[in-house]
């Protein structure tokens, strides 16, 4: 309250702040008690104390960060004094009128840090002061953030083993809560039934679908919108507002409620394209009571998401694609596969509204040799991999965006190729969000040779010719060169369908080639205006 900063860690500029003094700790504890009392006055039944993830209470408990020589350092009992001071202050103020859920890292997952054994010992000290032991993991001050907030390379429930260890210790007698990329009700029930926890929590899963618990309760698990772990929700500071890739209403629920009007009559809606944007449009139009027909030229739905079936770390995208496909069927959308839409065909259907979701094409940069027989696009790479076609052992990927990085990992991790990736800019996957990018780069370092600040000057049957800003030249041997240099919207193809109905709107990649979030947002917005 005096405006001075205190910390145990070095901030982003390398500056060290003074350590907490006992009087400051006492003021902080009193502030926690004030907040608890305010919560009680507002009608809350429970509060959560965040004592994990490298935050200040976690720092005090960590032998790696707490190197104090006074009464608050050294033994676990000493390191626990500040958290206990806070819990005592809260209990003295509100008694047992509020439940306290205490969040703690079951392990910091770092050398010399807080361990699961430390966690159990601490919980033994405080279990008479709290009501729920909430077991998370990791720390912001180690390279574990992408495990603490599980990324798409990790399985669902990946951190549940820590809560299970706490439960199996038989030393903790209060309910134990686990979390970590849970969303499927069956996995939650199994975790509880096998003694892994008493409670299971979701965070991102209730952002992608706030009604997920209610849907599970009423036997509608198939309608739960699956989280794809893209972290657009957590990294919203980079965007204009809090958002979710798979639920376009998140962060703007109130505004949409004011703007959206129920349709005055049932209309005949034609959607062209069965990728995520087209399927979202068809779903929303059907939910609004319209008659919807979706035309897709391929023999399957999903668009480019279909390739997620080939890559384990894209399982979350496969889950979302399957959800959309299932909901189209459940909502009664007529789907015509292997049907290439033409203006004449669509006009004959006498639509009241047309939504074009015709996608995008790979950018083919003007590089000598780019049309050689050994050059393929990322999409063709996945198709060849699925068909088992030979691409050789040495493969070069041109482009270090998200598509290029994921394609390189697919080739290296699943097809066991020797992969080299080149990127003109200073880093790879720069458009990705911080936590998934951390996991992505970790895997690239293990499986792929990456060169940044390098451009391709030509492609020959022997491989890729490259140069850097210093004038150095080299040839990267490659049997196949994979292009991942971006996507170009099929805007012209989409415009062919304008004028066939009173309402027309292009959506998804044919407007701007972006990502799942852009696809679902534009698809939702278009259909909600019909």
Where are these regions (language model features)?
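Local beta-strand N-terminus motif with an aromatic residue
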Residues: 44, 130, 197, 328, ...
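Redox-cofactor binding/interface segments in oxidoreductases and associated redox assembly factors
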Residues: 49, 134-135, 202, 356-357, ...
